[in-house]
Amino acid sequence: MTSVAHEASASTGRGGEGTPLLTAGGVAKTYRTGWWPRRRAKAVLRGANLRLWPGEVVGLVGENGSGKSTLMKILVGALDRDAGTVALAGRLGYCPQEPVLYERLTCDEHFELFGRAYGMPDVDIDRSRDAVYDTLGFADWRGARVEELSGGTRAKLNLGLALLPDPELLLLDEPYAGFDWDTYQRFWELTRQRRDTGRSLLIISHFITDAERFDRVYDLVDGRTVPR
């Protein structure tokens, strides 16, 4: 059975119905460093395959340097691939590992800035922003500048900006790094709610401790995705 066929058969259950929100096939990426004649090539991805259906929580696990973040950047269009295909359906939200925040702006100003970039009406920005504050529990910091925030609150804001447009598909790179226990539990309750309404999440990490929370898990090994 091919890898693509394997992952399709593994998608039965919650997933496997309707149109996939994400399909990636044969994704390859090689980084090249140095100058001729000593130019070196390092193949990071050698044919990665992924498929996410509506209403799924999928994990992507690999060691540091295995290419997880490279694959994520390719999936969201932030990095060109050398080979392979990527097809997306619906709105996409992306929470990078390194927060994309502005030190001198407040939390409220971030939501206003990103909401307008998403093309959201002001009333929708306000409603979604307030829901994010309530869900993640950091409304008390709405008027604070990023430079005043702890690492954990920055992580909440980073995640909240990805949640703002209520995307059908949410791609998260090490999303709960820096979360305390309460926020960690809030995150998984949020994940459950989104899955129950047909939305999907792809979560990448270097380890998974709560495997039962995922519908499926891929291991990224030698540049290839291996379904568990």
Model regions: which residues?
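Conserved ABC ATPase signature
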Residues: R145-G152
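Conserved ABC ATPase "signature" region
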Residues: E112, R116, V123-W141
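Catalytic Walker B motif of ABC-type/P-loop ATPase nucleotide-binding domains
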Residues: L170-E174
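Conserved structural motif at the start of ABC-family nucleotide-binding domains
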Residues: L22, L45-G47
